From Swiss-Prot:
Primary subcellular site in the record, as a coarse category: plastid
Protein name: NAD(P)H-quinone oxidoreductase subunit 4L, chloroplastic
Family membership noted in the UniProt record: Belongs to the complex I subunit 4L family.
Reactions it catalyzes: a plastoquinone + NADH + (n+1) H(+)(in) = a plastoquinol + NAD(+) + n H(+)(out); a plastoquinone + NADPH + (n+1) H(+)(in) = a plastoquinol + NADP(+) + n H(+)(out)
Enzyme class, broadest EC rank: translocase
Transmembrane regions listed in the UniProt entry: 2-22, 32-52, 61-81
Pfam families the UniProt entry points to: Oxidored_q2
Source organism of this protein record: Manihot esculenta (Cassava)
Subunit structure: NDH is composed of at least 16 different subunits, 5 of which are encoded in the nucleus.
Highest taxon listed in the record's lineage: Eukaryota
Alphabetized InterPro entries for the sequence: NADH_UbQ_OxRdtase_chain4L/K, NUOK/Mnh_C1-like
EC number: 7.1.1.-
Protein's cellular compartments: Plastid, Chloroplast thylakoid membrane
Phylogenetic classification of the source organism: Eukaryota, Viridiplantae, Streptophyta, Embryophyta, Tracheophyta
């Protein structure tokens, strides 16, 4: 694939993730949009690493690091959401003001 096609795809994924993160009122949907943003960033890292210097794997290694961070976020995020649901009986972002109690 050409560089422009991959960058346009990554920009679309990033834009969809940002739009979903801004407009979503559901915490689970916000976590999914955050994962979409991280995957778009990973696609950029791998693409630029392959396009500019294919012998050095700095972009690929950094992409694996971001995948590890996303895996930790995917493990901890739903646990936090379930704890908030248990205490507040809602997973909507507007209804869960954690500073009041």
């Amino acid at each position: 694939m050409m560089l422009e096609h991959v960058l346009v795809l990554s920009a679309y994924l990033f834009s969809i993730g940002i739009y979903g993160l801004i407009t979503s009122r559901n915490m689970v949907r916000a976590l999914m949009c955050l994962e979409l943003i991280l995957n778009a960033v990973n696609l950029n890292f791998v693409t630029f690493s392959d396009f500019f210097d294919s012998r050095q794997l700095k972009g690929n290694i950094f992409s694996i690091f971001v995948i590890a961070i996303a895996a930790a976020e995917a493990a901890i995020g739903p646990a936090i959401v379930s704890a908030i649901y248990r205490n507040r009986k809602s997973i909507h972002i507007n209804q869960s003001n954690l500073l009041n109690k």
